[in-house]
Curated annotation (Swiss-Prot):
Name of the protein described by the UniProt record: Fatty acid elongase 6
GO molecular-function terms, A-Z: fatty acid elongase activity
Active-site positions on this chain: 187
UniProt enzyme class: transferase
UniProt record, GO biological process: fatty acid elongation, monounsaturated fatty acid; fatty acid elongation, polyunsaturated fatty acid; fatty acid elongation, saturated fatty acid; sphingolipid biosynthetic process; unsaturated fatty acid biosynthetic process; very long-chain fatty acid biosynthetic process
InterPro entries (alphabetical): ELO_CS (IPR030457), ELO_fam (IPR002076)
Pathway in which this enzyme or protein is active: Lipid metabolism; polyunsaturated fatty acid biosynthesis
Record organism: Leishmania major
Motif HxxHH motif: chain residues: 184-188
Key word Nucleotide-binding present: no
């Protein structure tokens, strides 16, 4: 196991620089800040009481780190989700105008980028948690430099949820509408809101575990998506196809681990010894239960669909072979019938010649009959 000293050195070396937060915030707000601020102003004018309530609640519950982390304005979060949902509806309505895109290059860059980012976040959180002296579960949120390092990684994880919305854009541009399900949209919107809440109230402590495990699963998930785009057919693709359902099962296992974490903290740990927000742990538990139910339903439906496709393909192949066999049999039968009719005609012709020969023999006598028979036989030849 890595010692605390070694973990501190590694964590410091891979720490997210503070300028990444400030520069990215300046860039994003320069592009979308005016629209987000206009949305907040409209809320403040039309719903002043609700706006004041949310602001007061945030001031009372915010962690000190929340003031240093960008993108935590709740009205900007709501505006982002509304923009995401509007984009889904717009791309769906304009499918005939826009046409169908392959999005292969975009998909390769997007999936590889999220694969590498997930790898960085997963390993970074693991090492930073070790450097901060965390145990597996029941960890408190502090304000030390080591915990600020963890808070920045969790913030990066939170921002990556917006980047993952590109998944939906690619599906819609490829017109794979069957993939944009209720589960897909529900998961992509709610997870963004819940991590906003975690960063606002408790950006560290127990939240490191969920972010670390989810990032680890996404390492394999986005790596799988990248490779399937890179190898659309062939031996590699055949091997990858065997892991299709393993990705969904891996996601479900992470939900199970998160449920176990919440149950351990809420049930096993005495409430006076609990170091993290009980409210956040309860939200995490029930949210994981909802995802387990939805992903389980998705897995069952997809397995049934894949089985039905295999059965349909086998049935179609068998029907094709039966049709070919019947066609070959019909041709053989027709040839045999034709050959049979020819033999019957020849037999009838011989019988007619034989009858004719007998009549001639009776009419002309033996000598003349023999001569006539010879002539008749010559004629038959």
């Amino acid at each position: 196991m890595v010692s605390l000293e070694q973990a501190e050195q590694i964590a410091a070396a891979i720490e997210v620089p503070d300028w990444v937060l400030t520069k990215s915030a300046a860039l994003v707000y320069s592009c979308f800040g005016s629209a987000a601020n206009a949305f907040e102003s409209s809320i403040k004018i039309n719903f002043p009481a609700q706006h004041a309530f949310v602001e007061a609640w945030m001031r009372a519950r915010s962690h000190p780190f929340a003031e240093r982390l960008p993108y935590l304005n709740p009205w900007h979060v709501i505006a982002s989700i509304l923009a995401y949902l509007s984009l889904i509806v717009t791309l769906r309505l304009l499918h005939r105008v826009l046409g169908k895109f392959s999005c292969r290059t975009l998909g390769l860059v997007h999936n590889l980028g999220l694969h590498l980012l997930s790898l960085y976040m997963s390993l970074g959180l693991m090492i930073s948690a070790r450097a901060a002296g965390y145990s597996l579960w029941n960890n408190a949120v502090g304000t030390s430099p080591a915990e600020w390092r963890i808070a920045k990684l969790i913030w990066l994880f939170y921002v990556s949820k917006v980047v993952e919305w590109v998944d939906t854009v690619i599906m819609l541009l490829k017109q794979n509408y069957h993939q944009v399900t209720f589960l897909h949209v529900y998961h992509h919107t709610t997870v963004f809101v819940l991590w906003w809440l975690a960063l606002l109230v408790a950006p560290g402590g127990e939240s490191y575990y969920s972010a670390m495990v989810n990032s680890g699963v996404h390492v394999f998930m986005y790596g799988y998506y990248f490779l399937t785009l890179l190898f659309p057919s062939g031996i590699v693709r055949d091997v990858l196809s065997k892991f299709k359902f393993a990705i969904t099962k891996g996601q479900m296992w992470q939900f199970v681990f998160n449920c176990l974490q919440s149950a351990y903290d809420l049930v096993w740990v005495p409430r006076e010894e609990l170091k993290y927000s009980a409210e956040l742990l309860q939200i995490l538990f029930w949210y994981m239960i909802s995802l387990l139910a939805l992903f389980g339903n998705f897995l069952v439906k997809n397995k049934k669909f894949s089985h039905r496709r295999c059965v349909d393909a086998a049935t179609a192949s068998g029907a094709k072979e039966d049709t070919a066999a019947r066609s070959h049999g019909d041709r053989t039968h027709r040839t045999r019938v034709k050959a049979g009719m020819t033999n019957m005609q020849l037999e009838r012709l011989k019988n007619e010649k034989s009858t004719e020969m007998k009549l001639l023999m009776r009419k002309n006598g033996n000598g003349n009959g023999q001569k006539a028979s010879l002539q008749a036989m010559a004629g038959s030849r």
